[in-house]
Amino acid sequence: MAISCAVGMEMQEPKMNGTLSAGAAAGYRQEREGFLPTTRNPATGRKPVQFLDFEGKTSFGMSVFNLSNAIMGSGILGLAYAMAHTGVIFFLALLLCIALLSSYSIHLLLTCASVVGIRAYEQLGQRAFGPAGKVVVAIIICLHNVGAMSSYLFIIKSELPLVIGTFLHMDPEGDWFLKGNLLIILVSLLIILPLALMKHLGYLGYTSSLSLTCMLFFLISVIYKKFQIGCDVSHNDTVVEAEQAPLQAFNSSCEAELFTVDSQMSYTVPIMAFAFVCHPEVLPIYTELCRPTQRRMQAVANMSIGAMFIMYGLTATFGYLTFYSTVKAEMLEMYTQEDMLILCVRLAVLLAVTLTVPVVLFPIRRALQQLLFPSKAFSWLRHVAIALILLILVNILVICVPTIRDIFGFIGSTSAPSLIFILPSVFYLRIVPTEVEPLFSWPKIQALCFGVLGVLFMAISLGFMFANWATGQSRMSGH
């Protein structure tokens, strides 16, 4: 999951949908290799100014790192839970499918950007459907960012009491000042709000790179703890306490399920989709790429998605093989409070998510200002009020939601399929001219099927999730 840019760059004068001259169509075909055609004005002999006439400075390797960091987010903590409810083989197959589909959707975005020279996700919405399209895309991105903020604050809610309790040698369940709900309010007021009130991100924007480093540390620790805890969990002191996860609930034979389907599967695929959302960041990274071509940026995307697939697969597999069917949606909760290695992991993750929340809040506020107050000058009162209202709403959400799985599941069933499946396919169908790709050509049929798949995925996931909530199975699952 990544930090989504909810504010677009200034776009060029839009061309009419579905129409291109013969020369422009030829330019589009050349654009399979170059980002924008380099035609010249016959009157002046000068090349027309395009937004990418400046040379990008970011290397290929750094672009891979940036996009990998955009993909990486809190969703990695829920992947072992997803594997527990699908089985090892089925999970890895689903994860591979989500990765491949994410790569294809990025291909659709890059192709659309190549046609019209736009470098922001919501500007593609305006190009395809006018101002209403831009508003819809901005709302979806804001929803996804609110979900990301909620997941980060939920991690603070569950992990900070354990960290403070360890240092103070206190029971986080027994002392009122170690309650998670109180702590997230204090962290929001004392740390997140002051950072969110800054007028510009400045160096705070670089703190998002902490997430990738912290999650690598998390992965290494999960692998190490698997071999330390071993199989005989009933005699191991490093697992969670009995009241957190009853020992009899562990798989006594330590046999992993290779393929399984249960009522909680309605959460598993959305968790995987949530973990791969990076699409609003693709076009800005494309803009900054040195020698930007569609093929080169697609290679950046493929390498980033491939690296995250490996990292996600390892984390889920070793986490599941440590705790089997008892693993929780937030895997760090499974480890004991006194484990010093896990304490270091908790501190690293807490630092990363705390500093990332204001970074996520910035584009939401900017998008709201552009949508609600497009012609208004900067106002500190409005700047502070939007940040405060957003933090209050997210805190209420985190306090009321019982598990982080519900956040992963809902966002992974709504904004994630919209950003990965539905919007890229709709953009492709609307933006790519019929002179280049006829309506019934194979690429457009593929894009149409891709969008339909996203709609079905959203409908089925939400249907099963609401059914679980209505019947109480969500609470009875024990996680």
From Swiss-Prot:
- Hey, what tissues is this thing expressed in? Expressed in the ganglion cell layer and the nerve fiber layer (at protein level). Also expreseed in the cells of the inner nuclear layer and in the inner plexiform layer (at protein level). Expressed in Mueller and ganglion retinal cell.
- Please give, as recorded in its UniProt entry, the membrane topology of this protein: Multi-pass membrane protein
How its function is modulated: the record gives: Not inhibited by lithium. Partial allosteric regulation on ions sodium binding.
Disulfide bond annotation, renumbered to this chain:
C231-C254
> Which residue positions carry a glycan here?
N236
Q: Which GO terms describe its biological process?
A: amino acid export across plasma membrane; asparagine transmembrane transport; L-alanine transmembrane transport; L-glutamine import across plasma membrane; L-serine import across plasma membrane; neutral amino acid transport
Expression triggers: Down-regulated in Dgn3 deficient mice.
What does the entry list under GO cellular component? plasma membrane
Family, per entry: Belongs to the amino acid/polyamine transporter 2 family.
Cited function: Symporter that cotransports neutral amino acids and sodium ions, coupled to an H(+) antiporter activity. Releases L-glutamine and glycine from astroglial cells and may participate in the glutamate/GABA-L-glutamine cycle and the NMDA receptors activation. In addition, contributes significantly to L-glutamine uptake in retina, namely in ganglion and Mueller cells therefore, participates in the retinal glutamate-glutamine cycle. The transport activity is pH sensitive, Li(+) tolerant, bidirectional and associated with large uncoupled fluxes of protons.
Q: What is this protein called?
A: Sodium-coupled neutral amino acid transporter 5
- From which source organism is this entry? Mus musculus
Q: Organism classification, top ranks?
A: Eukaryota, Metazoa, Chordata, Craniata, Vertebrata
